[in-house]
């Protein structure tokens, strides 16, 4: 099964006042918590869609299947982020999980359970 993930990392940070995904929490950028929680071994591709160069640079530090994707519509909101991610999926993707980038408490085990349920449903 060719499973993809799209990490939505395009927030404007208006209420926060800056790019909150690069803000540090206990010495680690917020987005790293989300990326580190993704069970990369279960995905064929993990696309991180963003408008921020510093996030693209950070994602470049991660091995495959992580890939940074620059959005062509940075002001288009969440729906534009989703469209950009879907447009960049491999054509043989069997399914896609959408993940918000600003969830530092997300646990790898909960994502593994979600994927297992999805795979069980397909059988």
Regions found by a protein language model. Give the residues of each.
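Short glycine-rich anion-binding loops that position phosphate/pyrophosphate groups of nucleotides
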Residues: 11-13, 53, 74, 101-104
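Residues at secondary-structure transition points
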Residues: 17-20, 25-29, 72-80, 105, ...
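Short, glycine/charged-enriched secondary-structure capping and boundary segments
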Residues: 20-22, 60-64, 83-84, 111-115
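N-terminal glycine-rich phosphate-binding loop and ensuing alpha1 helix
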Residues: 1-50
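Conserved beta-loop-beta/alpha segment of the NTase-like Rossmann-fold superfamily
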Residues: 76-123
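Conserved N-terminal catalytic core of the sugar/cofactor nucleotidyltransferase
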Residues: 32-95
């Amino acid at each position: 099964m060719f499973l993809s993930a799209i990490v939505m990392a395009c927030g404007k940070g208006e209420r926060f006042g800056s790019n909150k995904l690069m803000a540090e929490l206990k010495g680690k950028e917020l987005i790293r918590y989300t990326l580190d929680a993704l069970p990369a071994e279960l995905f064929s591709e993990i696309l991180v869609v963003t408008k921020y160069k510093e996030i693209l640079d950070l994602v470049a530090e991660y091995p495959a299947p992580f890939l940074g994707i620059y959005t062509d519509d940075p002001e288009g909101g969440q729906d534009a982020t989703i469209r950009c991610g879907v447009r960049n999926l491999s054509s043989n993707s069997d399914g896609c999980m959408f993940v918000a980038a600003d969830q530092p408490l997300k646990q790898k085990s909960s994502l593994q359970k979600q994927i297992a349920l999805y795979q069980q449903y397909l059988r």
